[in-house]
């Protein structure tokens, strides 16, 4: 019997794949557990339509991510932190601080997707990497300034 997997099954394949299994295995285990459905003409057409929609959705998200990356690359963020006379920070600038600075500019990126090469502990200009989409990465330029110099 041919079935369409609804969930990843270790011995058979990934969700969305059409696989041939024995009738008893399909009827007594896969289908009742919600792991698969029978592969009929209607379900195969529905699967194909769903795949096409998924591909379109991913392309739209990728296009939006590229536009966002281009916008981010052209800006230099200002991050304010408490600093001493010598320019040394009281603490460090983290990916969360950069995410907050981006949010102030109207751009939302999860702080976990922003990586710093080394801890930022002094005033100055730096770069961070951010993964905007699965295959779209961007360099974020930012400048660390002392709090109170915002004027």
UniProtKB/Swiss-Prot annotation:
GO terms for biological process: translation. PANTHER family: 50S RIBOSOMAL PROTEIN L9. PROSITE patterns: RIBOSOMAL_L9 (PS00651). GO terms for molecular function: rRNA binding; structural constituent of ribosome. Pfam families: Ribosomal_L9_C, Ribosomal_L9_N. The gene is rplI. InterPro entries: Ribosomal_bL9, Ribosomal_bL9/RNase_H1_N, Ribosomal_bL9_bac/chp, Ribosomal_bL9_C, Ribosomal_bL9_C_sf, Ribosomal_bL9_N, Ribosomal_bL9_N_sf. GO terms for cellular component: ribonucleoprotein complex; ribosome. SUPFAM superfamilies: L9 N-domain-like, Ribosomal protein L9 C-domain. Keywords: Ribonucleoprotein, Ribosomal protein, RNA-binding, rRNA-binding. Belongs to the bacterial ribosomal protein bL9 family. This is Large ribosomal subunit protein bL9. It comes from Chlorobium phaeobacteroides (strain DSM 266 / SMG 266 / 2430). It comes from the Bacteria. Binds to the 23S rRNA. The keyword RNA-binding applies.
């Amino acid at each position: 019997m041919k079935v369409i997997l609804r969930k990843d099954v270790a011995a058979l394949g990934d969700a969305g794949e059409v696989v041939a299994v024995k009738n008893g295995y399909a009827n007594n285990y896969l289908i009742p557990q919600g792991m698969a459905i029978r592969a009929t003409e209607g379900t195969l057409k529905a699967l194909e339509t769903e795949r096409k929609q998924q591909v379109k959705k991913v392309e739209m998200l990728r296009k939006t991510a590229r536009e966002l990356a281009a916008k981010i690359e052209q800006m230099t963020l200002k991050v304010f932190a408490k600093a001493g006379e010598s320019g040394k920070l009281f603490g460090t600038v983290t990916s969360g601080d950069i995410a907050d600075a981006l949010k102030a500019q109207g751009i939302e990126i999860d702080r976990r997707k922003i990586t710093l090469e080394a801890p930022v502990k002094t005033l100055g200009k730096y770069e961070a990497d951010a993964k905007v989409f699965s295959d779209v990465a961007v360099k974020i330029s930012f400048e660390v300034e002392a709090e109170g110099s915002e004027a």
